[in-house]
Amino acid sequence: MPHAPPLGALLRHYAAGSALACDPVDQGLLNRGYRLRTTRGRYFLKHHFDPETAAPEAIARQHRATQRLAALGVPVAPPFPAHDGRTVAVVGGHTYALHPWIEGRHRHGAQLTAEQCGRLGALLGVVHASLERVMPLQGRERGRQRGRQWVRQWTEKGAREGGGARTGESAPHTEPRTPLPARHAETAEPVSPGANPADAGADPATTFALIDDLLARVRRHRPADSFDELARHRLLERRALLEQHVGRRPPHSGPVGWVHGDFHPFNLLYRGDAPAAIVDWDRLGVKPRAEEAVRAAAIFFVRPAGTLDLPKTRAYARAYRRTAGATPSELAAAVHRVWWERLNDFWMLRWHYERGDTRADPQFPAASALVVWWTREYDAVCDAFAG
């Protein structure tokens, strides 16, 4: 098994029994995961190795966040503590965490009804409101009472419908979790000194230079294939769009707060029709909250041809605004910033041509078409999020 974790040494940290089987799950773009079966149950073993997110202190912060969210009833899968009480295990210079195994499946927006899209938006709003409650920034009180109200309503609804359940059969033999003391829920988390969540939008001059570089890489690629042809078409098209809209660079962003950072279909597990767990909190950080809502919708509701399902987007956005306490103007500003971000972003092509990493290639046709359609239907997209 490639990159096999040191199970013997790892499991000595936990009251999780002895390993019976360990199989890699579909690898994400950043970290590795394993389905682990032991004499005491089933677990998800996560190997954190992405340099940007694998620092033990950053992982511990993620773990504190999910533990506090779980205490509020938000559907998450907090890690199990080791014998020493820590949730991060460092073995052989590698960093691991042990989580409950959550049975469920991923669902794209096309598989959701309008009502379920509303519940999806409400869930993300609850996450943002709950993070504001359990990891407040210094001096931020906005939304605290609103967050409590909507978390209570969400968890009561989830209890009635069976949503948000976590498997308990595989829990190590530790004391049952109790609600976190109030002082934990009110302690402000430090922000990374390098964090700059209020950056202005991308500089088009930098983007034009990047487009030229990528076009040169496409021309040099041999043998040329259909991906090269599409890449060249989209790069030329994007350059023309950017020249047309170069004066629309957005100013600094609006309200910020703690966000999941990577909310998309492969980081949300459903059991039946209800969300069972939001996973992969590696990108937890302080950023504009409404922008995360827009980015998530652009992934959940994009169609293969590169258009957004606007009726579903509208149901999602209205529910998000209600539970997060976000205003229509916040969403409209976020739509503009994310549109500009997409107009200037070429991460999939950079992975392909600069790193030789093709894992994101299947996403490129729809994602690259979306910004073209979004530019043409800009007013309709804004109305779906803010109307």
Regions picked out by a protein language model, each given a short descriptive name:
Residues 1-23, 141-142, 167, 180-181, ...:
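Regulatory N- and C-terminal appendages and interdomain linkers associated
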Residues 29-37, 44-45, 79, 245-291:
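Active-site acidic catalytic loop and adjacent metal/ATP-binding pocket
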Residues 214-256, 260-264:
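Loop-centered beta-sheet repeat module
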